[in-house]
Regions:
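Membrane-interfacial segments
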Residues: 43, 69, 100, 141-145, ...
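Regulatory cytosolic signal-relay segments
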Residues: 169-211
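Alpha-helical transmembrane segments of polytopic integral membrane proteins
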Residues: 62, 89, 165, 169-172, ...
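Short, Lys/Arg-rich, polar N-terminal cytosolic tail immediately upstream
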Residues: 1-16
Length: 211
């Protein structure tokens, strides 16, 4: 006898999709807050203020578009959305004039997300796409390079990006606890099945087991 193992049901896939959605919303809120703080202090020009509503709207658009294709191949959808996030990261760094603190925070959020999703391989892909898009935008647009980041902008950027990392790490920890609980339940079911098999072996002849 074999115990019934939990499968990747539509419900579990939906939970994973919602977790990815909320994570992306938090990440883009952190980026939008950095841009809003920079424009408020007149560190960034008002010409890039459109990036704030875009950062707030894109995660919802990505979620609804991804849901159409996630049932066929969820891993490809996740990687494709991560690649788009990497393009946005490079685009944001270039349009912000490669401001030190926001650019580093953008890269930190992107790297952390890539490591959580797929390890070093996806991290390398994300950094390569981000660097390529940043270089392309810098060549085409030639934005002015900004100097030291003001304290207000740096504080907002670090605060929101740190909040994103802490919340994501917390949910990852909770997922690990649930996984450990499921493994314990599977182990108990296996032990129960083994005891049942031993008890049946006492009453059934060897010819029955060979059938």
């Amino acid at each position: 006898m074999k115990p019934t193992l939990p499968d990747r049901s539509p419900t579990s896939r939906s939970v994973a999709s919602m977790r990815e959605y909320y994570s992306r919303v938090l990440a883009y809120i952190a980026c939008g807050a950095s841009i809003a703080a920079g424009t408020y202090t007149q560190y960034f020009s008002y010409g890039i203020l459109w990036m704030v509503p875009y950062a707030l709207l894109y995660p919802h658009l990505a979620y609804h578009l991804g849901q159409r294709f996630r049932q066929h191949d969820p891993r490809k959808v996740t990687r494709a959305l991560l690649a788009v996030d990497a393009v946005h990261c490079g685009l944001g760094m270039a349009l912000l004039g490669f401001s030190v603190v926001p650019s580093l925070m953008f890269l930190l959020v992107l790297s952390f997300t890539a490591l959580v999703i797929g390890g070093l391989r996806l991290l390398g892909m994300a950094l390569l796409v981000s660097a390529s898009s940043a270089l392309l935008v810098a060549v085409l647009v030639a934005p002015p390079l900004l100097g030291n980041t003001p304290v207000e902008v740096a504080a907002v950027s670090i605060l929101f990006c740190g909040l994103y990392i802490c919340i994501t790490a917390f949910f990852g920890h909770q997922q690990g606890l649930r996984l450990a609980q499921v493994r314990q339940e599977i182990a108990r079911e296996q032990e129960k099945a083994a005891r049942l098999a031993r008890n049946l072996a006492k009453y059934l002849s060897p010819q029955v087991w060979e059938m």
